[in-house]
Amino acid sequence: MDIKLKDFEGPLDLLLHLVSQYKVDIYEVPIVEVIEQYLNYIETLQVMKLEVAGDYMLMASQLMLIKSRRLLPKVVEHIEEEDLEQDLLEKIEEYSRFKAVSQALAKQHDQRAKWYSKPKQELIFEDAILQEDKTVMDLFLAFSNIMAAKRAVLKNNHTVIERDDYKIEDMMASIKQRLEKENVISLSAIFEECQTLNEVISIFLASLELIKLHVVFVEQLSNFGAIILRKEKK
């Protein structure tokens, strides 16, 4: 199965995206939740056999250290632990400022380029806004959290034999058929019925394709809420 997703520019870019979902000051975000979402994203890439760059793995090991120390009983305050968290948040804040400046400069460059040359036409589905201001990466991050929960359930089922012959076209047809009957379904409900991780992945990719083609419509009422598929646009 050949899968292509637009990646973040680096681990700090991913962390900034996760932190920004909370709509609060960087230093007030629930750091353990952010770490868990980052690790879920990395694990999902690995399950889907997508390449994970070394700097992402290095950051993952650092985040796991922070998380483990956070979850330990606090008999004595760990100054080193606080330093690790503070250093991480400062790096995210610094990257946020750098990215804002970079985007402003890029916008100015694009404006000037309009006067001197024909704009280059690009079609990048992986970074496209789908519906309700949701991008493919927004849905993928939500999916990675669901995937983590599903992996935990399947680990307790030792009788399941993995298949690798799920066809995206078949899954698309199955989702459309179900929507004909129910009009509205949540991806979580569909995933609960899956017996293997390959089946979960295939259904997710089929959903993305249906959304891209505007055959079904996607809705997510909150940043970390359920992913809802609708037969008709709300």
Curated annotation (Swiss-Prot):
It comes from the Bacteria. The keyword Signal does not apply. Pfam families: SMC_ScpA. It is found in: Cytoplasm. Keywords: Cell cycle, Cell division, Chromosome partition, Cytoplasm. GO terms for biological process: cell division; chromosome segregation; DNA replication. The gene is scpA. Gene3D superfamilies: 6.10.250.2410. InterPro entries: ScpA. Participates in chromosomal partition during cell division. May act via the formation of a condensin-like complex containing Smc and ScpB that pull DNA away from mid-cell into both cell halves. This is Segregation and condensation protein A. Component of a cohesin-like complex composed of ScpA, ScpB and the Smc homodimer, in which ScpA and ScpB bind to the head domain of Smc. The presence of the three proteins is required for the association of the complex with DNA.
